[in-house]
Structures are given as C-alpha cells and as structure tokens.
Amino acid sequence: MANAPRILALGLLALLCAAAGPAAAQNCGCQPNFCCSKFGYCGTTDAYCGDGCQSGPCRSGGGGGGGGGGGGGGSGGANVANVVTDAFFNGIKNQAGSGCEGKNFYTRSAFLSAVNAYPGFAHGGTEVEGKREIAAFFAHVTHETGHFCYISEINKSNAYCDASNRQWPCAAGQKYYGRGPLQISWNYNYGPAGRDIGFNGLADPNRVAQDAVIAFKTALWFWMNNVHRVMPQGFGATIRAINGALECNGNNPAQMNARVGYYKQYCQQLRVDPGPNLTC
C-alpha cells in the first residue's frame, strides 16, 4: 500500500543523504573523500565513484559499470532479464485487484527498459547475491504499490515541498507526493532524479505517473543511490534504508514483517536462500 508515512520516510532519508554530501572541494563542491559523479552529484557509492566519476576517490570501472543492463551487465551478479521472467513479474501484478490503475501501467518490458540504464543493479557480487537484490527490490515494490496496484500516493493533499531546499526549489502549483514503484517523493528527490534520468522532475513530477519506464527509472535511481550498497548487510538493512524510522526498532513490526514475507517468498521463487539479517 502507498501511504504518507512511508513516503515521508523516503523523503527524510534522501534529505539526510543530501545533507551529508555537498560541502567544499572540486567540481561538485564535495567534501574530501566524496566523489563527484558524472551527473555532478556528491557521494561515496559506485553510482558516484564508478563510471564517469569526475573527481574525488574515483574507482575505475565502478561496481557494475560496464554495458549489459537488463540482460547482463557489470562485474558478476544475476542476469536480470532471465530472472525477472513474465511469470515472475505478472505473478506479482496479477494479485492486484481488477480495478487497480497500475495493472495497465506497470509492465515487465518497462522495467527491463529502465534497468538498462542501471547496469549495477543486481551486479557487483555473486549470482546468488544478484538474485537476492532482485527479490529485495520487488519485495519493497510489492509492499509500496500493493502488488502494482497504485501508481500514485492515495492521499495527494500533501505537496511534499521542502521550501528550505534552494538547490531543488519547488515549482509553483506542483506536488511531490509519492509516485511510481517505490513512491518517490519530495522536491529534493524529484529534482536530481529528473536530472539524472532526463526529465524535469520539479516542473513536471507527474511524468513519473504517466510513463512506466520513467517510473521504474526513478525507483531504480533511488535504489542505486540509497539501497544497493547495503544489500550485503541483509534484507533488514534495506528496510532501514527505505523506511527505518517508522518500521525498524519495533516501531511497526507488522509492516516490517510484511516486507520480509514478500522477500522470502520471492527468494523461494528464485531458488536462493534469503540470507541472514532479515529484520531491523
């Protein structure tokens, strides 16, 4: 289900990440020990320090930087197109009610088109680790969208505009409530996501709800910048990265366990052990 508390958690996480990044130095104005990505953002993950890194402690090749995307990709991992079959994808979507708007919006082909832009997804480790990442991604997507039922947040009254953010100022009349597979929200997420993907996320945030490829790209953008790096720590770390403030440390065990349940279900379908540290 898509709801305001989870969207707020995503937004707060992104705000904390943004606050920790930029400061003083080099092309991006990054702190020492931060990389300036090819898109001009500061960070320490492969998305920043890998392919196209402009300055800072760049890593040649990056984690999954080569070509391949949906069918193959970077260094090690899972073949995404072979793992996310029609049966797997539609097995999730078919559990949504017949009246759900997302049933005619989210498609496997849109996901595979989007994942081509993120060759590091499900790569950088072993095949088992890659399959676990795929299972984790779709577990969170299932939970956030109600098995691909929802495209946009149910409650659209909140604009999710952080007026204090001068780098990504809100556009007049626009609202930045949750949209897409991971329900991206807040102006400071829509702005950089749009810039990286190739649309004006501040002036036209609704593109995420109109174009399924862009919708999946925004989800993968958030995932690769905030979640991918914690996958080796176990599924529980991905919950903490996405909605830890509201679900971890006993705050909402029912919601946390629902995510874990989807993850274990998808790991079983993909014939991989879910690994340790499933909760947070």
UniProtKB/Swiss-Prot annotation:
<keyword id="KW-0964">Secreted</keyword>
<dbReference type="GO" id="GO:0016998">
    <property type="term" value="P:cell wall macromolecule catabolic process"/>
</dbReference>
<feature type="site" description="Cleavage; by S.maydis">
    <location>
        <begin position="46"/>
        <end position="47"/>
    </location>
</feature>
<feature type="glycosylation site" description="N-linked (GlcNAc...) asparagine">
    <location>
        <position position="155"/>
    </location>
</feature>
<comment type="similarity">
    <text>Belongs to the glycosyl hydrolase 19 family. Chitinase class IV subfamily.</text>
</comment>
<dbReference type="GO" id="GO:0005576">
    <property type="term" value="C:extracellular region"/>
</dbReference>
<feature type="region of interest" description="Catalytic">
    <location>
        <begin position="78"/>
        <end position="280"/>
    </location>
</feature>
<dbReference type="GO" id="GO:0004568">
    <property type="term" value="F:chitinase activity"/>
</dbReference>
<feature type="site" description="Cleavage; by F.vanettenii Extracellular metalloproteinase MEP (fungalysin)">
    <location>
        <begin position="29"/>
        <end position="30"/>
    </location>
</feature>
<keyword id="KW-0624">Polysaccharide degradation</keyword>
<dbReference type="GO" id="GO:0008061">
    <property type="term" value="F:chitin binding"/>
</dbReference>
<keyword id="KW-0146">Chitin degradation</keyword>
<feature type="disulfide bond">
    <location>
        <begin position="248"/>
        <end position="280"/>
    </location>
</feature>
<feature type="glycosylation site" description="N-linked (GlcNAc...) asparagine">
    <location>
        <position position="277"/>
    </location>
</feature>
<feature type="disulfide bond">
    <location>
        <begin position="161"/>
        <end position="170"/>
    </location>
</feature>
<keyword id="KW-0325">Glycoprotein</keyword>
<feature type="signal peptide">
    <location>
        <begin position="1"/>
        <end position="25"/>
    </location>
</feature>
<keyword id="KW-0119">Carbohydrate metabolism</keyword>
<dbReference type="Pfam" id="PF00182">
    <property type="entry name" value="Glyco_hydro_19"/>
</dbReference>
<dbReference type="InterPro" id="IPR036861">
    <property type="entry name" value="Endochitinase-like_sf"/>
</dbReference>
<keyword id="KW-0020">Allergen</keyword>
<dbReference type="InterPro" id="IPR023346">
    <property type="entry name" value="Lysozyme-like_dom_sf"/>
</dbReference>
<keyword id="KW-1015">Disulfide bond</keyword>
<comment type="function">
    <text>Defense against chitin-containing fungal pathogens. Hydrolyzes glycol chitin and tetra-N-acetylchitotetraose in vitro. Its action is countered by fungal polyglycine hydrolases and fungalysin, that cleave the chitin-binding domain from the protein.</text>
</comment>
<dbReference type="GO" id="GO:0006040">
    <property type="term" value="P:amino sugar metabolic process"/>
</dbReference>
<keyword id="KW-0326">Glycosidase</keyword>
<keyword id="KW-0147">Chitin-binding</keyword>
<dbReference type="GO" id="GO:0006032">
    <property type="term" value="P:chitin catabolic process"/>
</dbReference>
<protein>
    <recommendedName>
        <fullName>Endochitinase A</fullName>
        <ecNumber>3.2.1.14</ecNumber>
    </recommendedName>
</protein>
<dbReference type="InterPro" id="IPR001002">
    <property type="entry name" value="Chitin-bd_1"/>
</dbReference>
<feature type="disulfide bond">
    <location>
        <begin position="35"/>
        <end position="49"/>
    </location>
</feature>
<keyword id="KW-0378">Hydrolase</keyword>
<feature type="disulfide bond">
    <location>
        <begin position="28"/>
        <end position="36"/>
    </location>
</feature>
<dbReference type="InterPro" id="IPR000726">
    <property type="entry name" value="Glyco_hydro_19_cat"/>
</dbReference>
<keyword id="KW-0732">Signal</keyword>
<dbReference type="Pfam" id="PF00187">
    <property type="entry name" value="Chitin_bind_1"/>
</dbReference>
<feature type="region of interest" description="Hinge region (poly-Gly)">
    <location>
        <begin position="61"/>
        <end position="77"/>
    </location>
</feature>
<feature type="active site" description="Proton donor">
    <location>
        <position position="144"/>
    </location>
</feature>
<dbReference type="InterPro" id="IPR016283">
    <property type="entry name" value="Glyco_hydro_19"/>
</dbReference>
<keyword id="KW-0611">Plant defense</keyword>
<feature type="domain" description="Chitin-binding type-1">
    <location>
        <begin position="26"/>
        <end position="60"/>
    </location>
</feature>
<feature type="disulfide bond">
    <location>
        <begin position="30"/>
        <end position="42"/>
    </location>
</feature>
